[in-house]
């Protein structure tokens, strides 16, 4: 077996999982299962929310250690599922190492589709608006606010901004859009319902869930870090919405 190729594959898999919002225990477990297929004496992984260290060692060879920093994080359950499934197939012997490497590399290189993401943002915000008892124009306003917010978030990430600023921009745009819709669209609309429905895609629910999972698995550092990340994200959303309402205060009714 090509141990270097196996290590590179495990590192790519771990990076994909961390970037996609997977729990740190899942990252460690997935990488360890791959590395233990080597049959070497030592295979260790230490994963945190911002990176990981992985080592392969055996008396018959020189040890190999890789440290990787992960700066960008988002939520992409499809990528997490795809990597986990490939890991299972590899450990069960359904695919060989070369096939595993190329499939993981394809996932690693694949770019997110902005059109699908924006449509998902619109559908999510509209769905929450309906759940909160919104009328037709309120649902329409929520979908539009989600669309504009999604463009702002995508543009901020594309420009390399920090996640705090990205969330501030997204929530600011959705607040401004919601207020303008309430002011200019016909009928009586509830601004609170529109804003609450529109911020749902930005709410750090996955980060909070992962914080609980990591803590229950004994990874207190990652659990505390993810909880702090969720708090900072929530603060950014509140600041963005507050600034938007402050800017258009004369139109708020």
What are these regions (language model features)?
Residues 111-186:
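Core alpha-helical transmembrane segments of integral membrane proteins
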Residues 183-253:
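Generic detector of multi-pass transmembrane helix bundles and their immediately adjacent loops
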